């Protein structure tokens, strides 16, 4: 089944009944009731292998339908919802954490992951090393006690690209699982499990929801690495609201048309940006000048609405701030993946690569507005800082 068809037909409840609603039922429940003790015990046993009703904190049928849809889209064995994307990443890290374990994390990883490492993992005795953003130095950084490689590709500021099949081949030769933050592609433009990745993490907050009104994360995992993932949310008290699950299900029905619209608009905006002398570098993976562009085009079905610019020499951070403040249709906000356009002055948080002497940078999320309006808005803002 094509991904476009999966988005419409998967995760819609029991399709074998004679009469049903087009959407799955929204089930809110903290307590699940059983007809007798034997039934209660039966479902407590079933939940070890299946997603069944057993306890509200472990999810309701609404949650399960969303998990089925995302799992089908990503081609995984199982999926597990979390209240935020960061919580999902934290669970992946905790699942492999132990005293004297060694983790490799790529430099473009979502910045708060570094805080998890500092506040929790290092105190537990986990050793952390950061790879180059493209993971090109992975082989030389692997140690006998390396238990996990966590990457993000493309990165969410400069869109660094990793050769995932190559990375996975190296990692698996050392029996090391590979996890990826796949939020950029959101299971639609890239299917990392097909390329050898073991665990895919998506912030459903962004494109899966698509309407900037939900926070949620999801872990999609292959059968080999599933192990205790289903126990982690309940053990640590993580649960996901069925109302939020319902909203993400609704958002995902239009994921295909939204992603294509974001990409088309981003293409048009990038074409305009290439005419501006105020810009030194445009970071957009579809550009032939983008590092590892060929790998991106080989593995991805498209690009999302993310574009970053680096201003030319002579422009200061203050100029970048004035530029962003002059924008009318680009709001200032830290997230992305919704229907609206955003612009933020940013600095790539890196340790393996030094970007401190580069910039200033502005990251855009190209929303679903008319691109003629967006281009006119950008032109006006550029003119306000013209040298």
Please give the residue ranges for each predicted region.
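Short conserved active-site loop signatures built around small residues
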Residues: 1-27
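Conserved PLP-enzyme active-site core in the AAT-like
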Residues: 7-15, 78-278, 283
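Glycine-rich beta-alpha junction loops
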Residues: 11-14, 28-35, 206, 254, ...
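Conserved N-terminal alpha-helix of the aminotransferase class I/II PLP-enzyme fold
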Residues: 36-87, 113-119
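Short, solvent-exposed beta-strand edge segments and adjacent coil->beta transition regions
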Residues: 50-52, 214-216, 302-306, 359-363
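PLP-dependent enzyme catalytic core of the Aspartate aminotransferase-like
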Residues: 118-119, 127-129, 315, 326, ...
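Short, well-ordered beta-strand elements within core beta-sheets of diverse protein domains
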Residues: 248-257, 305-313, 362-367
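Conserved small-domain helix->loop->beta segment predominantly found in fold-type I
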Residues: 267-328, 334-337, 347-356
């Amino acid at each position: 089944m094509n991904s476009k068809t999966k988005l419409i037909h998967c995760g819609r409840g029991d399709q074998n009944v004679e009469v049903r609603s087009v959407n799955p039922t929204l089930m809110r429940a903290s307590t699940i009731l059983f007809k007798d003790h034997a039934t209660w015990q039966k479902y407590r046993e079933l939940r070890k292998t299946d997603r069944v009703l057993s306890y509200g904190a472990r999810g309701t049928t609404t949650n399960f339908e969303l998990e089925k849809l995302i799992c089908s889209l990503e081609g995984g064995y199982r999926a597990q919802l979390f209240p935020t994307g960061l919580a999902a990443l934290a669970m992946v890290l905790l699942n492999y954490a132990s005293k004297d374990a060694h983790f490799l994390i790529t430099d473009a990883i979502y910045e708060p992951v570094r805080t998890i490492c500092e506040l929790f993992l290092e105190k537990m005795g986990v050793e952390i090393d950061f790879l180059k953003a493209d993971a090109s130095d992975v082989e030389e950084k692997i140690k006998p006690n390396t238990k996990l490689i966590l990457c993000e590709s493309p990165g969410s500021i400069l869109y660094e690209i990793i050769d995932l099949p190559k990375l996975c081949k190296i990692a698996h030769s050392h029996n090391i699982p590979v996890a990826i933050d796949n939020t950029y592609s959101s299971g639609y433009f890239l299917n990392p499990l097909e390329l050898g990745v073991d665990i895919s993490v998506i912030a459903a907050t962004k494109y899966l929801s698509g309407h900037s009104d939900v926070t949620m994360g999801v872990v999609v995992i292959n059968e080999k690495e599933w192990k205790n993932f289903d126990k982690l949310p309940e053990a640590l008290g993580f649960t996901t609201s069925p109302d939020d699950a319902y909203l993400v299900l609704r958002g995902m029905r239009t994921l295909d048309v939204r992603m294509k619209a974001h990409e088309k608009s981003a293409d048009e905006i990038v074409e305009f940006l290439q005419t501006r002398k105020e810009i030194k570098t445009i970071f957009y993976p579809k550009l032939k000048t983008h590092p590892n562009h060929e790998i991106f085009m080989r593995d991805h079905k498209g690009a999302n609405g993310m574009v970053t610019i680096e201003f030319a020499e002579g422009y200061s951070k203050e100029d970048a701030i004035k530029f962003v403040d002059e924008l009318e249709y680009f709001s200032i906000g830290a997230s992305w993946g919704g229907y609206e356009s955003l612009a933020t002055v940013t600095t790539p948080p890196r340790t393996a690569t030094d970007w401190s002497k580069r910039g200033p940078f502005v990251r855009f999320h190209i929303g679903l507005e008319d691109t003629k309006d967006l281009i006119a808005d950008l032109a006006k803002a550029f003119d306000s800082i013209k040298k």
